[in-house]
From Swiss-Prot:
Gene that specifies this protein: frr
Cross-referenced NCBIfam families: frr
GO biological process: translational termination
Record-linked Pfam families: RRF
Record keywords, A-Z: Cytoplasm, Protein biosynthesis
Function: Responsible for the release of ribosomes from messenger RNA at the termination of protein biosynthesis. May increase the efficiency of translation by recycling ribosomes from one round of translation to another.
SUPFAM superfamilies: Ribosome recycling factor, RRF
Entry's Gene Ontology molecular function annotations: ribosomal large subunit binding
Compartments where found: Cytoplasm
Protein name: Ribosome-recycling factor
Presence of keyword Cytoplasm: yes
Keyword Protein biosynthesis applies: yes
Length: 185
């Protein structure tokens, strides 16, 4: 039972790291990636549809993205969704593709984005610690109910602490990489 609890806790911790990785991918750096468009939904025939399902992305320059819709009739809707998003970019439409030129990040904007990244990292750490607390309570209950011995309980808590440190370390490493990416010009 303790092993099941540890396995479940590790899955939840992995999910927290995965969410942090996605959050970091959505924070814009000096180099643009298609991931910055991942949260944009396009009103496509009345249904909100992720822009990645409607178009392909090409990055010819570090600050330019060319969006090529699979269906030319969705060009206007994609352009409107990008313009209305919080990306701070004004897309231009030439009839077949949409060009998005992103402005250079100012030093102050970079610092603000580092703060956002640190906040996202702290949210992930808190989530991991909450999973640890819940799993520790479950292990304590299993030992208290007599379903496992105290030695097993201590071993389980030790394994849980090691997993917690490992996953918090992964979040810290993701944050370190994102900060260096943001602060390099």
């Amino acid at each position: 039972m303790i092993d099941d609890t540890l396995l479940e806790a590790e899955e939840k911790m992995e999910k927290a790291v995965s969410v942090a990785r996605e959050d970091f991918a959505n924070i814009r750096t000096g180099r643009i990636t298609p991931a910055v468009f991942s949260k944009i939904l396009v009103d496509y025939y009345g249904a909100p549809t992720p822009v990645q399902q409607l178009a392909s992305f090409h990055i010819p320059e570090p600050r330019m993205v060319i969006i090529t819709p699979y269906d030319k009739s969705s060009l206007g809707a994609i352009e409107k969704a990008v313009r209305d998003s919080d990306l701070g970019v004004n897309p231009s439409n030439d009839g077949t593709i949409i060009r998005c030129v992103f402005p250079e990040l100012s030093e102050q904007r970079r610092r603000d984005l580092v703060k956002v990244a640190r906040t996202k990292a702290e949210e992930a750490r808190v989530s991991i610690r909450n999973v640890r607390r819940h799993a520790k309570d479950t292990i304590d209950r299993i030992v208290r109910d007599g379903d496992a011995g105290e030695d097993e309980g201590r071993r389980g808590e030790k394994d849980l602490d090691e997993a917690t440190h490992r996953y918090v370390g992964q979040v810290d490493e993701l944050l370190r990489l994102k900060e260096s990416d943001l602060l390099s010009v």
